[in-house]
């Protein structure tokens, strides 16, 4: 099963395909604080878990919207883009023009969102994407599968976040409807539009064929997920080139697969005085500090927005009382008091209007805080999670490098010990031979040792011959591993020669692996360094936009409130 198959897995309903009451719909999200705007991917504990995460279990059935019968007049009948357009040249021209607009923050726009019927006859909420004069409609599940695909295709790139699926508990409430829950859909539409534009700002994503196919109305997304390059992705990106995981070399399959237990600590790596290690360690510590700042900030912003909403609700009720009280002058029929009561009524009415303006301004300000500061801080938190995922991948590639480097050093040391043992044996033999010529006693001892050694070798060969027919290849490898742990001077000359030949062959393969992993790690360092630098620039630009919008919204709020109270004061002064 394709883990990104989205047409059978309608976007959001875990009860689809069952007899549950809400099997055909999803639940509305409340207007209050929401912790589920962005998905936070878990950082895998080992490469084995990383491999398993790519082969996830079959997702639960979900539905974008109730599959109810809707009149064609009221339904937004968006046909799948491949049925509307059949013009690859037009798309290529538009996308080429789009690439030249990299500085435009809103190159790609989601111009509308609503119910549509796909080519399979299913109703779902679709998001109409417009760019360069071409329109394509995609569902939320297709956005989600696009992001998952990009994470696997570009493991060294920080992929922008998208809004998460709604939690299951919220499906127990009112089903989400394209016409009734406009605010919720607009929020997701805004976040998905931001996701596409953030992707477009990243050169590696912008130029990737999968992202271009997502924006091309001629491609069915289900077919894209079942064809290369997505369909030929390896189960474990650690055993593939980091910049092009769909084209692994045979040597990549020989690389070790590290786990968390074998990972080196930052202190050990920094102790090597490697400039890149120190640099990436600084990146990691900066992200941790940044996260420690953003998490309480996001919580505080939600609290402030909640307080402003409570304040606006109080103003709404208070303004209604003042407006009702201003109408009470009709009970006075005395002509002498009529003009005075009329001015009093006007002053009360203006006061009520000022309170109403404060109420409306507070609502607008609350919405502005949610869009700029709250959503912005959540998005940056998710970017930090994604950056940590990328750094985690680098740590595993780095562990592969050090594992191979350490293994090569051990093999070289063993070969040197074996060869030195041979030289020592030769020197010892020459010394004994020289002494034997001068001393008959030494000659007798050497002759006795030679006979014992010959008898021992003959006996060993006979014993091994008895068990050779029943021995398995594993037994041979076991004996080899035992002999590799034996001190060199305890081995015979033939055993040392065999072991040296074997180790030299292993060393050839290890050197090839070392050259490969060295190249991979260099590519990972360059790509991640560039990606993290871009993230840092994005954070600076994001904070500038957030504070500029926040200052503008605060100024507009105070200005509207001030003008309304000035008008009310003029009416009160005339009483």
Swiss-Prot record:
Pfam families: PX (PF00787). Gene3D superfamilies: Arfaptin homology (AH) domain/BAR domain (1.20.1270.60), Phox-like domain (3.30.1520.10). Its main location: membrane. The keyword Transport applies. It is found in: Endosome membrane; Endomembrane system. It is a peripheral membrane protein. Residues 41-55, 469-484 have a biased composition (Polar residues). It comes from the Eukaryota. The keyword Cell cycle does not apply. Residues 30-66, 467-486 are annotated as: Disordered. One of its GO terms (molecular function) is phosphatidylinositol-3-phosphate binding. SUPFAM superfamilies: PX domain. A 1,2-diacyl-sn-glycero-3-phospho-(1D-myo-inositol-3-phosphate) binds at residues 139, 141, 165, 188. InterPro entries: AH/BAR_dom_sf, PX_dom, PX_dom_sf, PX_Snx41/Atg20, Sorting_Nexin_Autophagy. GO terms for biological process: autophagy; protein transport; retrograde transport, endosome to Golgi. One of its GO terms (cellular component) is endosome membrane. Belongs to the sorting nexin family. May be required for cytoplasm to vacuole transport (Cvt) and pexophagy. The PX domain binds phosphatidylinositol 3-phosphate which is necessary for peripheral membrane localization to the perivacuolar punctate structures. This is Sorting nexin-41. The gene is SNX41.
């Amino acid at each position: 099963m394709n883990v990104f198959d989205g047409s059978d897995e309608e976007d959001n309903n875990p009860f689809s395909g069952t007899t549950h009451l809400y099997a055909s719909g999803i639940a509305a999200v409340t207007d209050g604080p929401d912790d589920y705007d962005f998905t936070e991917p878990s950082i895998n504990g080992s490469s084995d878990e990383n491999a398993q995460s790519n082969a996830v279990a079959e997702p639960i059935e979900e539905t974008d919207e109730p599959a109810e019968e809707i009149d064609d007049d009221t339904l937004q009948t968006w046909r799948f883009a491949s049925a509307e357009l059949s013009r690859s040249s037009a798309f290529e021209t538009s996308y080429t023009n789009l690439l030249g607009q990299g500085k435009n923050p809103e190159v790609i726009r989601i111009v509308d969102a609503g119910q549509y019927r796909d080519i399979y006859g299913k109703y779902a909420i679709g998001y109409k994407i417009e760019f360069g004069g071409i329109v394509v409609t995609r569902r939320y599940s297709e956005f989600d599968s696009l992001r998952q695909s990009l994470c696997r295709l570009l493991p060294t790139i920080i992929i922008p976040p998208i809004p998460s699926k709604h939690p299951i508990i919220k499906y127990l409430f009112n089903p989400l409807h394209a016409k009734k829950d406009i605010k919720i859909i607009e929020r997701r539409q805004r976040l998905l539009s931001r996701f596409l534009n953030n992707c477009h700002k990243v050169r590696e994503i912008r130029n990737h064929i999968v992202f271009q196919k997502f924006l091309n109305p001629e491609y069915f997304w289900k077919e894209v997920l079942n064809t290369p390059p997505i369909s030929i992705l390896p189960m474990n990106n650690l055993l593939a080139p980091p910049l092009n995981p769909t084209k692994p070399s045979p040597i990549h399959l020989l690389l070790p697969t590290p786990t968390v237990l074998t990972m080196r600590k930052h202190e050990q790596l920094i102790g090597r005085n490697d400039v890149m290690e120190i640099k990436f360690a600084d990146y990691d510590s900066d992200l941790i500090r940044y996260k420690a700042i953003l998490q309480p900030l996001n919580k505080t912003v939600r609290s402030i927005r909640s307080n402003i909403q409570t304040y606006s609700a109080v103003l709404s009720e208070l303004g209604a009382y003042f407006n009702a009280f201003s109408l009470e002058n009709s009970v006075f029929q005395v002509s002498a008091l009529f003009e005075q009561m009329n001015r009093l009524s006007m002053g009360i009415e203006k006061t009520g209007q000022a309170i109403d303006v404060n109420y409306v301004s507070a609502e607008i300000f609350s919405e502005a805080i949610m869009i700029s500061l709250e959503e912005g801080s959540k998005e940056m938190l998710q970017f930090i999670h994604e950056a940590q995922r990328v750094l985690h991948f680098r740590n595993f590639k780095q562990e592969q490098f050090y594992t191979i480097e350490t293994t090569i050093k051990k093999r070289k040391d063993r070969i040197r010990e074996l060869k030195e043992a041979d030289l020592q044996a030769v020197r010892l033999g020459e010394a004994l031979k020289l002494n034997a010529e001068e001393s008959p006693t030494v000659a007798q001892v050497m002759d006795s040792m030679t006979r014992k050694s010959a008898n021992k070798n003959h006996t060993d060969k006979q014993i091994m011959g008895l068990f050779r027919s029943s021995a398995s290849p594993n037994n041979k490898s076991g004996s080899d591993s035992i002999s590799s742990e034996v001190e060199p001077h305890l081995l015979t000359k033939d055993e040392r020669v065999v072991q040296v030949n074997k180790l030299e062959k292993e060393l050839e393969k290890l050197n090839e692996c070392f050259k490969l992993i060295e190249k991979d790690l260099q590519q990972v360092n360059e790509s991640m360094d560039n990606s993290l630098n871009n993230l840092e620039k994005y954070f600076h630009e994001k904070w500038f936009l957030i504070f500029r919008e926040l200052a503008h919204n605060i100024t507009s709020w105070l200005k509207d409130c001030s003008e309304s109270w000035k008008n009310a004061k003029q009416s009160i002064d005339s009483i």
